[in-house]
Amino acid sequence: METMITREDDSPRVAEMVRQCNFGEIQSYGPISVIPVLGEGKASGPEYVSLSEALEDGLIEVTEVSEGGDVPYLNVKNLSARKVLLLDGEELMGAKQNRVLNTTVLVSEEDELTIPVSCTERGRWRYKGKTFEDSNLIMAKKTQYLKSSSVSKSLCVNESYDSDQGGVWNSIDAMHAKYGSGSHTAAMKHVYDQQGDLLSAYVEKFPCVEKQRGVVVFVDGELAGCEMISRNQPYLRCHEKIIKSFCIDLLHRKIEKEEKTGSLDKAKDWLDSIEKWKSERFKSLGIGDDLRLKNGVSHGNALLADETIVHFVGFGPQVLEN
């Protein structure tokens, strides 16, 4: 891997991506408020399809790296003439155990990569099939924040995309304990499955709107995070996953008639502040560069390719309070 590069223009580049977008009407349900981020005009940068679409159409194949497998790594083979975007935190299910992506990767046409992952099912190490499928989930944002922060530390210390696997397992265990969910393999997916009705209620309140490319999310009126993708169609395929990842930690909360909501001014202030965050750049395992951004307890990472921010996920202070 190439040496870390500190670039003063990377944080402003992410902030500029947001400034080029418009915002939709605020949507609120329970303690959560969502502001849709809308892309205007033709998208710039590389064209690609989402992981969900690629797996559905047989464009890529994801397997263990060998017959025996290796927990922190998977093999991705792009069988198509289209680029494929895999998002930080997206879960793949099957093979010897379920895993999530440790960082966002844009896989080139007809390319084959070894990608870094974290285990989200520590009670299973046996085959359910040779290939992985889309679990239709992104890990809970609090867990993703902790994982992403540990990956950023690994990049700075030894230039690897390794996560704190023990921390990921502990966070998943805490989710099971919170909801009293049962799972003989300690699978993260089982929490989502067993809370399906409550999650669906939130998803229905936060529909994807025309031209949407992202969300800014508030909890109890305070900013919890933001996620954006550079193209509308891939975002549409990921929207429900993203909404669930913000909501899963809050299903124990009662729905009150009067809840604090977010505001467009608060969203713009936080997004504008990204311009001044500390940023570090690393060579991505796929196309482009992996950007790591931090400002106090706020943290984010982005994929830069063809001078375009293809994906950005940012975590605000409130994500840790959930």
Regions found by a protein language model. Name each.
Residues 82-83, 92-94, 232-233:
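Short, surface-exposed beta-strand-loop junctions and turns on beta-sheet-rich folds
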Residues 71, 87-90:
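Glycine-centered loop/turn motifs
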Residues 126-155:
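Short, low-hydrophobicity acidic/polar segments
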Residues 73-84:
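Asparagine-centered strand-capping/turn motif at beta-strand->loop junctions
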Residues 2-17, 25, 151-322:
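Long, low-complexity, serine/threonine/proline-rich intrinsically disordered regulatory regions
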Residues 3, 8-33, 38-39, 91, ...:
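Intrinsically disordered, low-complexity Pro/Gly/Ser/Thr-rich segments with frequent PxxP/GP/PP motifs
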Residues 36-61:
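Edge strands and adjacent loops of beta-rich recognition modules
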Residues 67-73:
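Short, solvent-exposed loop/turn segments enriched in Ser/Thr/Gly
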